[in-house]
Regions:
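Active-site rim elements
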Residues: 42-50, 141-143, 208-215, 249-254, ...
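Surface-exposed patches in mature extracellular/periplasmic domains of secreted proteins
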Residues: 66-80, 140-145, 167-174, 237-245, ...
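Short acidic/polar inter-strand loop motif in beta-rich domains
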Residues: 374-387
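Zinc-dependent metallopeptidase catalytic helix centered on the HExxH motif
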Residues: 57, 61-62, 112-180
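Beta-strand-rich binding/interaction modules
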Residues: 237-238, 279-280, 294-373
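Amphipathic alpha-helical substructures
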Residues: 214-313, 317
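Acidic/His/Gly-enriched intrinsically disordered linker/tail segments
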Residues: 119, 150, 154-227, 253-254
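Hydrophobic helix-coil surface modules that form long, contiguous segments used
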Residues: 1-126, 167
Length: 388
């Protein structure tokens, strides 16, 4: 199998000493005929090739940090005529013509829908570039394991948004959209998650759940990795444990078709002590629940804040998990909002439908808000907070 683009292309090149990569961007000097026929014949995708080149460069730099270096040394970003379709081959990425148009041009084409379509444009380049790792450098063993490609690519697009946006908003909105994609009911009263676990892959799609494959293998698969990153976050070293896991998984499986169990083996090598919710030194529970299972928890936190000595305050709270089996395990984080800056206070481990023991913490001052699951750290049906 081979991939290629054929046409009258303009080429732009850039050598990046930081990533040690040669980047090329190819775009046409005119839009496809179907756009010319709608009065947009003067648009020139090649004039916007720099934007695609910069997004690809930033993606390569970011993902080499998180996943490790690539062996290829070059990548070509190429425009193809479809408006909303991208695809990746080793060293060759197809991007839709829409990715080579600026916001004004997209507004001319789409009107008010341009704002919604902008989300796709923001995400398509990092998603497709990340397939240089997920799908090419590391393959997948069977259809059961394809979430290791598409889910990991969706996670990578989220990383890109977090790294390139000044505020956290787009990153949080990205995972909220994913949550709704997974859980919202269709016209038959069924959600994608009702179709089955991520592990079922292509078999998820039926007459009543036609888009379940896309919504689970891509969106929920990405969410699995997002949750794992949150579980492995360390207040002293940040994401370093998770980054070490991802480097290990890539190094161990380069040139191989990895399975879900291969990924679990890497997780078990790098798991934090507070992830040992079955007291067996393993994180099998996490993959069992989120890749092989379909349970979606709900959370409720009740808290109170009272004055303490020295101008400080005492935060007292309790968290309840519900809507799951008695064996379902998870940790959910609590955040504090001090003047718009979120601080992660810690996480609470829960098993089954239960209320965890009450926690009590002395704080230097009263927070503006106490937030549960602030960055969609856990895929939840709801995360409700009440208190003063």
């Amino acid at each position: 199998m081979a991939g290629f683009n054929y046409g009258d292309y303009k080429k732009k090149e850039r050598d990046d000493p930081e990533s040690k990569y040669e980047l090329e961007a190819y775009a046409t000097s005119e839009v496809p005929a179907y756009l010319q026929n709608h009065g947009f014949g003067t648009m020139a995708p090649s004039a916007m090739a720099d934007n695609a080149l910069v997004d690809a460069l930033n993606s390569i730099r970011l993902f080499q940090l998180w996943f490790g270096a690539l062996p290829y040394g070059r990548i070509a970003i190429t425009q193809q005529p479809e408006f909303n379709f991208g695809q990746s081959w080793p060293t060759l990425v197809y991007l839709p013509v829409s990715a080579f148009l600026d916001g004004t041009q997209r507004w001319s084409l789409l009107g008010g829908n341009a704002f919604r379509f902008a989300e796709f444009i923001d995400e398509v380049t990092p998603h497709e570039v990340s397939h240089q790792w997920w799908g090419h450098l590391v393959g997948w063993a069977t259809y059961h394991d394809q979430w290791l490609s598409e889910g990991f690519a969706d996670f990578s697009a989220g990383l890109f948004l977090q790294a390139t946006e000044k505020k956290q908003d787009k990153f949080d909105q990205y995972w909220e959209r994913a949550r709704k994609t997974i859980l919202e009911k269709n016209q038959f009263g069924q959600s994608a998650n009702d179709a089955g676990p991520v592990w079922m892959g292509l078999r998820l799609s039926t007459f009543r759940t036609g888009s379940a494959y896309q919504k689970l293998v891509y969106s929920k698969g990405g969410y699995v990795l997002h949750m794992l990153r949150s579980l492995m976050w360390n207040p002293k070293t940040g994401d370093q444990d998770f980054i070490a896991l991802m480097h290990d998984f890539v190094t161990t499986n380069t040139g191989k078709n990895a399975s879900t169990e291969d990924f679990l083996a890497a997780v078990n090598r790098h798991m934090r002590k507070d992830m040992d919710l079955e007291a067996n030194g393993r994180a099998d529970w996490f993959i069992r629940e989120w890749v092989y299972g379909t349970a979606i928890p709900s959370y409720r936190m009740e808290y109170s804040i009272a004055p303490a000595d020295g101008g400080k305050v005492t935060l007292t709270g309790k968290i309840t998990q519900s809507g799951v089996a008695d064996t379902f395990r998870m940790r959910v984080p609590v955040y504090l909002d001090f003047d718009g800056n979120l601080t992660r206070l810690g996480s609470i481990g829960l098993i089954g439908n239960q209320t965890a023991p009450e926690f009590r913490v002395i704080l230097p001052k009263k927070p503006k808000r106490v937030i549960l699951n602030a960055h969609h750290d856990v895929l939840a049906a709801e995360s409700v907070v009440s208190g003063n």
